[in-house]
């Protein structure tokens, strides 16, 4: 009875163990109970010792190896020829050196790569049989490392809190009652640990975990001439949160309203932040009203998988997208995004409404864009070629200007003539333009009828009245602003007569101002600006030197635009206007700058004997001028000589100084003969002048 007690105890233990591990039990083969593969795996690096214990004595039966032997049970070891359980097994033959059997375990001193596989221990006698298998993994170190990443243990530490890292599975290498001598490494390197990291017999204690503590920690133990290493990977997380997740978009506290066009595709993305809450996965989902999206019948509406946008120390930002392929009326309404963890739930709402449809939006925008582009192009062309376009229109569709049909001339030409002492010199370019080129082109090429005072003025009354009458007979007033004209204040002629001044101010006559040079350096330039301000109907045209003489230049186009329209009577070739070249200006005569002075001198031919030599000399010079410049008309007056030294009252038109027009006489150094002449005729308004007076008189027309 006493001998049966151990057997009964073993059988009772087996029955209890069977009831406890019924889930893991694989079955019975040949009358032997097979517990398949034990969950505990033995992992070792190549060259390290390892001990594999029979798992039957550590959770499957309530007996140890000694008790099993005492009741006649024997323990046998097998190795599977394959990697899978149930493959052909063969008994292990122990050589007693590198591989040996010791009680309920087998030792490898050391383990080699070919030792990896399944090892089965079988406890049996003639009436009882039980079997279980264990797994052995043998691996080499990683390149340049002291561990293999597949054989690592893992631990987690919270930021700012303490963490203990143990040296696992070294019980078989330490004698009972002894403290193991362990050396710790981080990333296979010896460390100078900070003060908050402590080493004990089999622990590495970190008092305050930091982010830079993440890494591989290796403990090394010397056993029987062999090194035993265990490596643990420490990951650091944020402190365990006690807060519910936070929705980033849409806003939790504000309803997001969206107007969407029917038939269009809609994507709504919800983003949420989850603090570290252990190994619990974040939960985010969409609902419409009280319905989950997956419970809705429409296949057009779906939500994506939860995606991790970013993650740091266990804290995650995740997103989930709600997609509606083709929005319909039934899809309009309120949609809610929910995010929850073990600490609570948050939600954000989106209201989807119908957008007012804009028909042909793209076509309309494209059409408007094309129209605006065309308008901008047309405005640019008009701005750059405005004069050319207006002239072209006027040439093809316009009639001749009927404004001022009762006027005989198209324009009155006001200009400045050159002094007599400059007669033998080459005319300046501006004077040549004003006296030669401008009248010739306007009359011969464009067919305009100009009133040129040197040529067309017939004295009928006073000088100012004649000028006023001639200006009234013209549709335009052309003022050629040469430096000489500005210096002499040529516009004073039009300011002296009130009727002329009123015409300029009121706009009864249109004025064309031709600037022939940069006049800013001229002393009277400020008066020129005041003149421009006082004229109501004013057009300013700039002559830029010889380059403006070409018929196709912008100067002539602007001038034609400001002149009354008249169809041209003849054409000219397109080259620079130069009287030295044959062409339309080959017959151009040089304009005499002293024609009226010539007329005055001729009128004084029979004057006082004392004046006769100088007058005769002046007459000869003026005769030469008339021969050279026969283009202009001169006037001869026969004035009888009076013996008493006085001239009879004779109506004579002459060129007077502006000072005389203002009621003053010029003050200069005169001879006694000139003084006597002035005193004798001081009260005569219109007098013939001496040649010297003629040379310094006004030459403004």
From Swiss-Prot:
Q: Which Pfam families match?
A: Ig_3, TIR
Record's protein name: Interleukin-1 receptor accessory protein-like 1-A
Q: What is its EC number?
A: 3.2.2.6
Task: Tell me the classification of the organism that encodes this protein.
Answer: Eukaryota, Metazoa, Chordata, Craniata, Vertebrata
- The region annotated as signal peptide is 1-19
Question: Which stretches make up the Ig-like C2-type domain?
Answer: 33-133, 146-235, 245-353
- Where mainly located? membrane
Keyword Transmembrane helix assigned:
yes
State the PANTHER family in the record. INTERLEUKIN-1 RECEPTOR ACCESSORY PROTEIN-LIKE 1 (PTHR11890:SF22), INTERLEUKIN-1 RECEPTOR FAMILY MEMBER (PTHR11890)
* UniProt organism field: Danio rerio
* Family matches, as Gene3D superfamilies: Immunoglobulins, Toll/interleukin-1 receptor homology (TIR) domain
Its domain of life reads Eukaryota
UniProt domain comment: The TIR domain mediates NAD(+) hydrolase (NADase) activity. Self-association of TIR domains is required for NADase activity.
From the record, give the cysteines joined by S-S bonds: 54-121, 167-219, 270-337
Q: Which residues cross the membrane?
A: 362-382
Q: Which residues are glycosylated?
A: 64, 125, 141, 216, 267, 334
Which CDD domains does this UniProt record tie to the protein? Ig (cd00096), Ig1_IL1RAPL-1_like (cd05896)
Topology: which residues are Extracellular? 20-361
Where, per UniProt, does this protein localize? Cell membrane; Cytoplasm
Membrane topology value = Single-pass type I membrane protein
- Tell me a Gene Ontology molecular-function term this record carries: NAD+ nucleosidase activity, cyclic ADP-ribose generating
Keywords, ordered alphabetically: Cell membrane, Cytoplasm, Disulfide bond, Glycoprotein, Hydrolase, Immunoglobulin domain, Membrane, NAD, Receptor, Repeat, Signal, Transmembrane, Transmembrane helix
What function does this protein fulfil?
May regulate secretion and presynaptic differentiation through inhibition of the activity of N-type voltage-gated calcium channel. During presynaptic differentiation may regulate both synaptic vesicle accumulation in axon terminals and subsequent axon terminal remodeling.
Ranges facing Cytoplasmic side: 383-701
Task: Please list the residues that make up the active site.
Answer: 495
Q: Which family does it belong to?
A: Belongs to the interleukin-1 receptor family.
**Known catalysed reaction(s)?**
NAD(+) + H2O = ADP-D-ribose + nicotinamide + H(+)
């Amino acid at each position: 009875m006493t001998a049966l007690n151990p057997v009964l105890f073993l059988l009772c233990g087996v029955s209890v163990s069977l009831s406890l591990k019924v889930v893991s039990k694989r079955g019975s083969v040949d009358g032997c109970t097979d517990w398949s593969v034990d969950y505990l795996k033995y992992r070792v690096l190549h060259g390290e010792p390892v001990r594999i214990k029979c798992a039957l004595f550590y959770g499957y039966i309530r007996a140890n190896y000694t008790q099993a032997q005492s009741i006649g049970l024997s323990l046998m070891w097998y190795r599977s020829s394959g990697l899978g359980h149930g493959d052909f097994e063969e008994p292990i033959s122990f050589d007693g050196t590198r591989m040996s059997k010791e009680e309920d375990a087998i030792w490898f001193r050391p383990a080699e790569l070919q030792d990896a596989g399944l090892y089965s221990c079988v406890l049996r006698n003639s009436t009882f049989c039980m079997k279980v298998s264990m797994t052995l993994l043998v691996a080499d170190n990683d390149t340049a490392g002291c561990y293999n990443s597949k054989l690592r243990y893992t631990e987690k530490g919270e930021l700012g809190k303490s963490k203990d890292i143990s040296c696992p599975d070294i019980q078989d290498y330490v004698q009972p009652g002894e403290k193991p001598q362990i050396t710790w490494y981080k990333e296979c390197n010896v460390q100078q640990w900070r003060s908050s990291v402590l080493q004990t017999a089999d622990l590495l204690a970190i008092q305050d975990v930091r982010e830079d503590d993440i890494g591989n920690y290796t403990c090394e133990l010397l056993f029987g001439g062999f090194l035993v290493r265990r490596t643990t990977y420490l990951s650091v997380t944020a402190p365990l949160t006690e807060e519910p997740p936070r929705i980033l978009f849409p806003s939790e506290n504000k309803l997001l309203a969206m107007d969407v066009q029917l038939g269009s595709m809609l994507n709504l993305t919800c983003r949420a932040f989850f603090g570290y809450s252990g190994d619990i996965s974040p939960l985010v989902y969409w609902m419409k009203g009280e319905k989950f999206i997956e419970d809705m019948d429409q296949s057009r509406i779906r939500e994506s998988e939860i995606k991790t946008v970013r993650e740091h120390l266990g804290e995650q930002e995740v997103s989930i997208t709600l997609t509606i392929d083709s929005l319909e009326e039934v899809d309009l309404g309120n949609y809610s995004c929910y995010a929850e963890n073990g600490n609570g739930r948050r939600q954000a709402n989106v209201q989807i409404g119908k957008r007012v449809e804009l028909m042909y939006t793209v076509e309309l925008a494209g059409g408007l864009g094309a129209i605006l582009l065309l308008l901008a192009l047309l405005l640019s062309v008009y701005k750059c070629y405005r004069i050319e376009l207006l002239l072209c229109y006027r040439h093809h569709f316009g009639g001749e200007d009927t404004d001022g049909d009762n006027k005989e001339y198209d324009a009155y030409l006001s200009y400045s003539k050159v002094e007599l002492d400059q007669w033998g010199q080459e005319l300046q370019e501006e004077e040549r333009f004003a006296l030669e080129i401008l009248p010739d082109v306007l009359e011969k090429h464009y067919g305009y009828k100009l009133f040129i005072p040197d040529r067309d003025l017939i004295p009928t009354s006073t000088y100012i009245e004649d000028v006023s009458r001639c200006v009234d007979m013209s549709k335009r007033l052309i003022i050629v602003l040469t430096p000489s004209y500005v210096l002499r204040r040529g516009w004073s002629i039009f300011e002296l007569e009130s009727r002329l001044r009123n015409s300029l101010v009121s706009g009864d006559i249109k004025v064309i101002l031709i600037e022939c040079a940069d006049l800013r350096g001229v002393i009277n330039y400020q008066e020129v600006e005041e003149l421009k301000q006082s004229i109501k109907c004013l057009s300013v045209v700039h002559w830029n030197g010889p380059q403006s003489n070409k018929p196709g230049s912008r100067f002539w186009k602007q001038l034609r635009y400001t002149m009354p329209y008249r169809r041209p009577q003849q054409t000219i070739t397109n080259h620079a206007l130069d009287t030295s070249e044959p062409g339309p200006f080959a017959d151009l005569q040089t304009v005499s700058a002293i024609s009226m002075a010539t007329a005055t001198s001729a009128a004084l031919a029979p004057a006082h004997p004392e004046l006769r030599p100088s007058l005769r000399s002046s007459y000869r010079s003026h005769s030469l001028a008339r021969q050279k410049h026969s283009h202009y008309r001169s006037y001869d007056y026969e004035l009888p000589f009076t013996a008493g030294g006085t001239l009879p009252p004779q109506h004579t038109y002459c060129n007077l100084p502006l000072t005389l027009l203002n009621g003053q006489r010029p003050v200069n150094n005169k001879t006694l003969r000139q003084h006597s002449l002035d005193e004798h005729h001081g009260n005569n308004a219109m007098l013939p002048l001496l040649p010297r007076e003629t040379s310094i008189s006004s030459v403004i027309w």
